[in-house]
């Protein structure tokens, strides 16, 4: 045997099913869904082999059998999906740990703040001296001073400090002692009797009433009656006024009477304008005297009727616009006729105006 015969040979048999059984191979199984079918590579390989077979067999195509010798791991979809899943799980766990750490940091910071606040509050309470401590300290000082002055031993009961009441927050009311209450009660029960010579001082209200009700000695008897009736000792001081009260007030010099009730002495001060005459009936302040007959119902009427005009006998009604224009036109015509300036054109204009007025 030669060396070439001793070497193993790898042969791939291509042919129909009628070929020899020694070169028969198993039909390759159909690839699963996890394996990708490389169409380009197989098509190129198939085209090259078909060209060779055509050359050998004279252009006749026959079926072929392909033996698979190895399987590549780079195109495995299962492994890619597993990698993706593991990466997703890893990312989720990382995010979950990050959120947990963030929440834990927040809770830790909150607890730390609460502890610091409690510590500060406790320190403030311990450093702030209470009112009871100040009161007890002042009592001790007073007892020590009195002991040094007297140099006398005191009973242990007296030396004991009184029990301090618990602190009360908010509004505190100090109850008065019973001795002061009884003394004030006796003081109120036994008022000082005023002497006949001394008069009690008048209050502000009494002074105001006396100034309001003080009238001149020259006042009328009605004023004195009103003064007596409106004195502070009268019982009907708060009643409503009657017709008799209104009649008692004088109509003339009403303002002066009112001012006198408010304490005016009746003397005029400054520059005073004297009123020499009274106003006419139903005439306002500052109205002038009417020269003609005065009748309020005779407005817009002539003097020949019921009056209402001036002394010359002219109508006092307000002039209407039409009457004013008519009078002006008449005056204009008279002036034109007088100066001889009338013409045919002016006559036509007058006719048009007359037709328009109608």
UniProtKB/Swiss-Prot annotation:
Broad class of where this protein is predominantly found: nucleus
Keyword field contains Nucleus: yes
Segments of this protein annotated with the region Disordered: 1-250, 298-358
Keywords: mRNA processing, mRNA splicing, Nucleus, Spliceosome
Segments passing through the bilayer: none
Keyword Repeat tagged: no
InterPro entries for this protein: Spp2/MOS2_G-patch
Classification via Pfam families: G-patch_2 (PF12656)
Compositional bias annotation for Polar residues: 174-185
Biased segments, Basic and acidic residues type: 80-137, 145-160, 233-246, 309-358
UniProt record similarity statement: Belongs to the SPP2 family.
Known role: Involved in spliceosome maturation and the first step of pre-mRNA splicing.
Binding partners and assembly: Associated with the spliceosome.
Name by which UniProt lists this protein: Pre-mRNA-splicing factor spp2
Phylogenetic lineage: Eukaryota, Fungi, Dikarya, Ascomycota, Pezizomycotina
Annotated gene: msp-40
